[in-house]
Amino acid sequence: MIQMQTNLDVADNSGARRVMCIKVLGGSKRRYASVGDIIVVSIKEAIPRGRVKKGDVMKAVVVRTAKDIRRPDGSVIRFDNNAAVLIDNKKEPIGTRIFGPVPRELRAKNHMKIISLAPEVL
């Protein structure tokens, strides 16, 4: 469950390390984002010579949340951290690699490029 002011790790090699959610997209009163949702983020920490720099405002897809994700079969999946992948305006990832596992729920939200780059899909 991601809301405004939530700090997230970045799970790709775009050059950002930490980002802060500044808006949850999808409706004027929408408060929370879950896995697969698109949010607007501000880069809070970045590595030198990366594709992005500190202070940039970008869109990102939430790929891991510490809050439980309920599946239709009754099982529950949760992660140790909140993480996102930076995307461009065409919803393509900016980085060329994804770090860490991502859940199957991204497939239902049509983030196939992230699924294909991920080392493990849970």
Curated annotation (Swiss-Prot):
- Report if keyword Ribosomal protein is assigned: yes
Q: Which domain of life is it from?
A: Bacteria
**Which SMART domains does UniProt cross-reference here?**
Ribosomal_L14
Q: Which Gene3D superfamilies match?
A: Ribosomal protein L14
Please provide one cellular component term from the Gene Ontology annotations of this protein: cytosolic large ribosomal subunit
UniProt KW keywords: Ribonucleoprotein, Ribosomal protein, RNA-binding, rRNA-binding
**Swiss-Prot/TrEMBL GO biological process terms:** translation
HAMAP family referenced in this protein's UniProt entry, alphabetically: Ribosomal_uL14
Write out the function statement from the record.
Binds to 23S rRNA. Forms part of two intersubunit bridges in the 70S ribosome.
Q: Which family does it belong to?
A: Belongs to the universal ribosomal protein uL14 family.
This protein's name: Large ribosomal subunit protein uL14
